[in-house]
Amino acid sequence: MDIIFRDQHLETAMVGGAMLNTAVSLGRLHMPAFLISEWGNDGVGEITQNFLTNNAVNTSFCKSYHGNTSLSVALIDTKGNASYTFYKNYPEKRFQIDTPDFEPGDFVLFGSFFSIDPGIRTQMTNILKQARNSGALLIYDPNFRKNHLASLEQLLPFIEENIRYSHIIRGSHEDFHYIYRVDSCQKLFEKVHSLGCEVLIITHGSDEILLFKECTKTRVAAAAVEAVSTIGAGDSFNAGLMYELYRRQISPNNLNMIPSCEWAEIVSVASSFAANTCSHYENYISQEFAQHILSSQAI
């Protein structure tokens, strides 16, 4: 749950979490979205469950534990950017879920601290191994926060293992600066490509988006928007990316066959998802925007 303040005043509260935000956007687009997660058996957990159900997100692989659901407090500045403080109270035994039966044609998005948390690393790697071995297409969003920098030395092996499992990495310029301290996007791609990454997408706020694959770099203008809040923008970008890849029937087998012009179309759609989310306080694309996308695809 995200509790959002602006100018030191409470603005709103939103069911949140990076993968949850993406799943809600996909659910609003009538996509078969499943969330793998956990939350407490408290009132906030009940709100979360009901919200996901109402937004067509399948929670078969979510479990509630005895305790409090995690909270984040977001302070929004004058540019709509947020700084976060997290409040977590996990049980001793965590992430006791059933692993999905992945199959070719599935897309698996994972990331944030949840994907590198030492407390659930074994369960996470088991899921990633099964997904990769089953022919699913894996997308990794590091979503690495500044407050985890003190633990980077411990966490970097997990980040790089996640990169090895992934077909596509999508992250912000800020994420990669925190992780690798490199300013050259080309050098960054060389690094992650050496670990097995096939496609790297770097977003940088309102600046152009860069997409790297072997021997090719594609530049795409970011969709313009007057930001109310940037919370969930990257998550909605991921939703747009997954929506377009799913719609175009992209798989690990044909990922490298996508021409640069088609990648530009895919990234432009993803950027429009992010822009829509920046235009309001919800962490996901609006219901109206989702209907617009669905209507335009039906033509």
Tell me what each language-model feature is.
Residues D101-E103, E160-I163, S194:
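A short, aliphatic-rich alpha-helical micro-motif
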Residues P32-S112, I293-I299:
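Conserved N-terminal subdomain of the carbohydrate kinase-like
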Residues P32, L137, I168, E198-V199:
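Proline-centered loop/turn at the N-terminus of a beta-strand
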Residues L26, S172, G234:
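Short, conserved phosphate/pyrophosphate- and ester-handling motifs at nucleotide-, phospho-/glycolipid
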Residues K129, C185-I299:
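Conserved phosphate-binding/catalytic region of the ribokinase-like
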Residues P104-G105, G135, S166, C197:
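Short, well-ordered alpha-helix to beta-strand connector turns
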Residues I116-E190, E208:
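Conserved beta-alpha-beta core of the PfkB/ribokinase-like small-molecule kinase fold
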Residues M1-V57:
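Glycine-rich phosphate/adenosyl-contacting loop at the front of the ribokinase-like
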